[in-house]
Each structure stands twice: as structure tokens, then as C-alpha cells.
Amino acid sequence: MFETCEAIVMRTVDYGETNKIVTLFTREWGKVAAMARGAKKPSSRLSAVTQPLSYGHYVIRRSRGVGVLHQGELIDSMRALREDLFAAAYAVYIVELTDKSTEEQKRNPYLFELLLQTLQYMSEGRDLEILTFIYEMKMLAVLGIPPVLDRCARCGATEGRFSFSVKEAGFLCHRCEASDPHRFPLSSASVRLLRLFFHIDLARLGSISVKESTKMELGAVLSAYYDEYAGLSLKTKRFLQQIGELKDKLSPDGGQGASFSL
């Protein structure tokens, strides 16, 4: 029986001379794989709808293994993402993070909406790094490894200066920071943003300014935390870091900061 779903194309793998196996992240069923027969042919009606990052409605015959993709209708091709090297790198990274963090056919409409909203914001030209930080923070809850952000992870203090400890899985107050010599010093802006990114409703984004030094603090904390607790091997992570370095060199503002809607 064929069924219709709303989905984002996560990735494709060539199968034979003309076919593709397409992995879709669906609102209705979670992650599913389907055979798209003839999709490698430029003239195929499945060629455009199976491009990575595409968002649309898909008609699938599901099975326990690989189903069959019968047809699709694009809602948003996300062409702007695929045509921009920087945007594509960040978009493919959050898609791979989602892929590696989810099981087959485990429905999660919250995560579907989060991924879709993030990709749409990226496509609109919003700050790629900040959107990625927000997504990474929210994925920590999905992975079951949320850090302690509302208090000191050791003594429970809620006031004062904080640093971030990967070992303690959260903030350390100034009285407890000596317990971790490898802690990450944080500006007050980074402390606020880590909390904000974890809790904010992505649909309510408006406007803030984030200094490059603050971005560097946030990126260092998140990279170290994921390396320690997530257990994920992401091929796109290193490429994303290289892209970030290239973007800094090409930035007309010299990496002084960026404005972003919040």
C-alpha cells in the first residue's frame, strides 16, 4: 500500500546504473529508506525530488527494510542552500547530525520541525554558525545528554561567574572552577547564549549581535562536549571546520561579529 508523507531528503546512495536509495526524514514516521527507480536519469520524474535537502510530499510503499518511492512533489527544493558552498556545508552537517542521532522509523515530529525550520532559516541567509549552535544545543536533549545550565554542576549555585566543564557536564561557578583545570572560561554573553539556545523556540527568532570571540567560545564548548558524550562520528564536521576557517578569511568585517535574528 502506498502512503503519502511530508519529508526532507537526508541523503542518497546510487544503486545500480539508474537507481537511488533515498533516506528521508519524515514527519509521520521518522527516518525511512526507499528505492527510487530511475532517479539517476536526468529525465526521471524522481530526479529533482530526490536531491539532498529537498523538502516535499512523497508517496512511498513502506517495508521493514527499504521501501519504494513512487512519486514526489517539491514544497521547497532548498536550492539556495545547495548553490552556496558555506550554506550547504552547515546544512549537510545538521542533517548528518540528525541522521546519526536517530533510528529508523522512530517518529519525532518535534525534531522534524526543528530540522525543517533550521534549514529554511539557513536558506533565507541567516547566520549559519548561530543556527548550527542552536541546533546542536537542542540535539543534546534529543540524544539524552543535556548539560547542566541552570546552576553550578557541583554545588548548585545560581549566581556569580561561570565557566563550562565537560567533565562535570555543565557550568561551574567561580568557587568550584578549580575542580576542573580543563574548564572553558566563558564570557557572560556565552553563558546567556548557551542557556538561550537550549530553551528558545526556534520559531520566535528576532535580532541580536554575536561577537566573533563569543562564537569561538560557544564552538569550543560544543565541540568538546559532543566529542566526550555524543559518541558520533560525523564526516561533515571536519569539512565544516575548514569551511569556517575559509569564511573567516573571506569575511569583509574581519571576523568582528555578526548580527542575527532572535
Swiss-Prot record:
Cellular component terms (Gene Ontology): bacterial nucleoid
Entry keyword DNA damage: yes
Sequence intervals crossing the membrane: none
Keywords: DNA damage, DNA recombination, DNA repair
One GO-annotated biological process of the protein: DNA recombination
Disulfide topology: none
Pfam families xref list: RecO_C, RecO_N
UniProt family annotation: Belongs to the RecO family.
Stated role: Involved in DNA repair and RecF pathway recombination.
Protein name as annotated: DNA repair protein RecO
Organism expressing this protein natively: Geobacillus kaustophilus (strain HTA426)
Gene responsible for this protein: recO
